[in-house]
Structure formats: structure tokens, C-alpha cells
Amino acid sequence: QADLWRKGLADWGQAPERIARLKKAADFTVYTPGSNAGTPVNILRNFAPPPPALQQDRDLLRERIQTTATSLLALLGLDADPITSREHILLSNIFDVSWAQNQGLDLAGLIRAVQDPPFERIGVMDLESFFPSKDRFQLAMRFNNLLAAPGFEAWLEGDPLDVGRFLYTAEGKPRASIFTISHLSDTERMFFVAMLLNEILGWVRTQPGTSSLRAIVYMDEIF
């Protein structure tokens, strides 16, 4: 089998010496979100405010908020429409207000904010008319059950969702970050991919212009 792989690499012009130079020049890390099989990714411990450059672009900020709310509700099995779903509208307003105050939210903080939102009105309606407290409690319970589910702690461990750390080590060595999500359910895969791409877009928006290639994002086996 080793000979087969060696021949295949050689057919693509990848000699052993070239591969050895790559291995020496870069760090390779395999990330396994939601699992400790590789390096876990801490994706749910804190929903930090986007960088200032992204916050100043209302269209991008709105997209970040909607994607975050949609992805979280999908984890609960809720196919929430941003326009008609009161759950989606509530979460979107919570993130909008918190991030405007430059405050991050961990999952526990989000649960508390669902029960006691940092505002009294949504649109022109008072909060209790739009989303009564007993119904908000049910939504908070669903998030709490998710947090308490066996194995869920793996989503709260490991390296933070930080694009800079995915590209370079602490010593400045280039890093090839490989994310494997084959062990996740379809819903969990979509959640992780959405959150990762959100972070990448936010990182891109903070970078100054350049004519040099900074990073490559490659996605394999998309169905």
C-alpha cells in the first residue's frame, strides 16, 4: 500500500524530498470539532463580538447575526426563518444588542439572555406580547438540554475559533489546519461550517490590501 501511495504522489510530481521540505517548513494540525479524536475546537464557549471593521458594515454584521442565530437554532432541530420565526428574531436581537455593547456571550449567558433579554420591545411590540416569558423559558430549556447532553462538552474544549491561530503557530510557523467533520451529524456539520466561514470572512475584513496570497480555504467532498 505504501508503494501505491508513493507512486501516486510521484505521478503528481510530489517527490519524497519535496514532501519532507513541506513537513519541515509547516505545522500540520488535524482539528475534530465536537470530538477529542484530534484537536478539538472550542466553538460554543463564547460568541465574541465581530471585529470593528465588520461591525461598521451593517450588511455584513446583519449576515453574521442571522447566520449565528440560524446555526444555533438548527442545533435544536428548529428550521427557523429569519423573518417569521420569533425564536430567530429574539436571538438576532440579543446578539445585536450584546455585540453593539462589545459584549460576548457564552452559551450559559445566551440561555440567561433568552429568559431575560436586554431589551423590553421588539419592533413596536412589547417583549411579553411578542414572546411571552413562559415560551422563552421553553427555548432556554432546549438550549440547556443541549448544553447538558452527554458528549457536548467536546464543543467547549480545545483551541478557540481563531483564524490567525489556524494559519500560524504561536512561534510564527505556517500552519496547515485540517478540519475533519465526518463524525458529525448533517446538522452539526452545517453548524460548524457556517461558524468557521463566518470567522474567516470576519478575518478577511480586518486584513489590509495586498497583492500576495495570504491563505487558501479548500473544501473537499461537498454534497
Predicted segments with their positions:
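P-loop NTPase motor domains
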Residues: 3-223
